Amino acid sequence: MWKFASIVVLVVCLAWAVYCEDQRPPSLKTRFGRSADEPESDNYVSNDIMEKRSAQRPPSLKTRFGRSEGAEVMEKRSAQRPPSLKTRFGRSVANPESDGYMRKRSAESEPFVTRIRHGRANKKRAAN
């Protein structure tokens, strides 16, 4: 019973504080809820100082599209690597039964596996 009563008292006090804060005239409030006559504390940094600090920072690597220049370099490097043995379904071409439920199939019944394995060269052979 006492716990319930103390929770009710805390909620009423909080509601009263919010009500009193809302009743203050807007001229005494600042953007951050601090009154204009209160002195700023030592750890409070004003917006003007923050804007000056951000203006002093060197520009970041991000472009206007949100990508860094380093990301484009990584894409070029990954494009130079040889294709992996994984197919687009996440199974290895070298071991088609790696998941355990897939039946063993021949290359004739599933021609896309050979295309993925050999990449562009096989597509050129198939076109000729």
UniProtKB/Swiss-Prot annotation:
Residues 35-55, 68-79, 92-128 form a propeptide. The modification Pyrrolidone carboxylic acid is found at Q23, Q56, Q80. One of its GO terms (cellular component) is extracellular region. Residues 66-78 have a biased composition (Basic and acidic residues). One of its GO terms (biological process) is negative regulation of host-seeking behavior. Residues 115-128 have a biased composition (Basic residues). This is Head peptide. It comes from Aedes aegypti. The gene is HP-I.
